[in-house]
Amino acid sequence: MRTTAVILSGPRDLGLQTIQLNEPAPGDIVVEITHSGISTGTEKLFYTGQMPPFPGMGYPLVPGYEAAGEVVEAAPDTGFRPGDRVFVPGSNCFAPTDAGPIRGLFGAATKRLVTPAHRAVRIDPALEAEGALLALAATARHALAGLNHVLPDLIVGHGTLGRLLARLTIAAGGEPPVVWETKAERRRHAEGYEVIDPATDQRRDYRSIYDASGDPKLIDSLVMRLAKGGEIVLAGFYTEPVAFTFVPAFMKEARLRIAAEWQPEDMVATRALIESGALSLANLITHTRPASEAAEAYATAFSDPDCLKMILDWRATA
């Protein structure tokens, strides 16, 4: 079985190639991908060559961990059947070539993939491109959920993650948070909350500040906005060291928490919120390109400040 996939052969060396898939094992399903998302966190690090080494890392690789598509092959014991609409967080299903392995890191940017059935999530057939956003929505939910976690009253950044954090806060019954955004064009599409220029905000009593900007240089300024005993949650992805001045944080008795990737229970809860209508995925995708233009799409996703979320459309790809 063959597929057309995005292959990142090295830093900034990206294009489409036809490659071989591993044959499905018992318990696997085969999914025809219609849409995949481009992450400006981990994928950008692979693309630029800045990803710190970890076991299993290497080029060439198939990037991506956000994909939506339809099941085309499934045994009855998998719980799926052909035609089911699913979200898949990628797969490592690519057969090695004579030159060596092709790594699935994380393997979602492909026309077709093979995955263990338990990794796929059945979604509403009405979710087209938005179906690829489930991982990001579940990541936002993971940052908010948990014992003793305080819902944000300030969110920094009105990108895709910031919007999801704000929407989920309201869906959880919290007060509408204040959202900071320095770019005027990104202050649009607020749904039930206020987005402001941080320069106009004089508050110094925020109990819980969620940073969704990924800017490691903001911590000191955020500490000054905390109430005593308040918390800063690092919900973004940081490519440079995060540091802060100790004395102001000491005076505020500030707490710092890092939110990582989603877990299965986050995905279950997020899907339920979407299906019930409590969480909207509208106005999050700003750019869509056919998969045949993958090289241009990745360059735009990582360089255009107006691009909140880029989606590759695989439907016309053979």
Swiss-Prot record:
What's the Enzyme Commission number for this chain?
Answer: 1.-.-.-
Q: Which Gene3D superfamilies match?
A: Medium-chain alcohol dehydrogenases, catalytic domain (3.90.180.10), NAD(P)-binding Rossmann-like Domain (3.40.50.720)
Q: Which InterPro entries match?
A: ADH-like_N, BchC, GroES-like_sf, NAD(P)-bd_dom_sf
One GO biological-process annotation of the entry reads: photosynthesis
Recorded metabolic or biological pathway in which this protein acts: Porphyrin-containing compound metabolism; bacteriochlorophyll biosynthesis (light-independent)
Recorded hits in CDD domains, A to Z, give: 2-desacetyl-2-hydroxyethyl_bacteriochlorophyllide_like (cd08255)
Q: Kindly give the SUPFAM superfamilies that the UniProt entry links to this protein.
A: GroES-like, NAD(P)-binding Rossmann-fold domains
Q: Which GO terms describe its molecular function?
A: bacteriochlorophyllide-a dehydrogenase activity
Q: Does the keyword Oxidoreductase apply?
A: yes
Q: Which UniProt keywords apply?
A: Bacteriochlorophyll biosynthesis, Chlorophyll biosynthesis, Oxidoreductase, Photosynthesis
**What is this protein for, i.e. what is its function?**
This protein catalyzes the penultimate step in bacteriochlorophyll a biosynthesis.
Q: Supply the name of the protein.
A: 2-desacetyl-2-hydroxyethyl bacteriochlorophyllide A dehydrogenase
